[in-house]
Amino acid sequence: MKNKKVLVILGGTSGEREVSLDTGKACIKAIKKLGYKVSTFDPKKKSLSLINKKKIDVIFNALHGKDGEDGVVQSYFEYLRIPYTHSGVISSYNAMNKVISKEIFKKNRIKTPSYFVFRKNNFTKAKLNKLIQIKKIKFP
């Protein structure tokens, strides 16, 4: 088992790149300490298509944010049939989509604060003032 080759994927292109690099470095240190062979991959520097499944046994996903936590890389890893750490494709997508997450919580009777949905392309301060009445939003 200690001969397993672990590819730590870190960095990426999201706004959370720096956090991902820090996470990846900590993971690399811990995985090496356990005696595994570790290599790294940063999708900002190389295309995911360059991942060679013959040279790795498992992928440790240390990416944060878009493409790393939303099911995108998970989908690619499943396509390659490489085991990976992280939630699966659908769970990752649902967790990153806050509206879907809220609907799942409500459907399963999990208390969650009220919310409003704003689309980036039509968000203005004037619309915000018209749509939100802060007193109506309370924690469960």
Predicted segments with their positions:
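A generic structural motif
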Residues: 32-39
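Hydrophobic alpha-helical packing residues
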Residues: 31-32, 77, 105
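A short, GP-enriched loop/loop-strand-helix hinge that lies immediately N-terminal to
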Residues: 12-16, 55-96, 111-120
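Glycine- and acidic-residue-enriched helix-capping/strand-helix junction motifs
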Residues: 13-26, 30
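Eukaryote-biased intrinsically disordered, low-complexity acidic regions enriched in Ser/Thr/Pro
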Residues: 40-53
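Active-site nucleotide/adenylate-binding loops and adjacent lid/helix of ATP-dependent enzymes
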Residues: 2-10, 22, 38, 53-54, ...
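Cofactor-binding loop segments of dinucleotide-utilizing enzymes, especially the Rossmann-like FAD-
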Residues: 11-12, 43
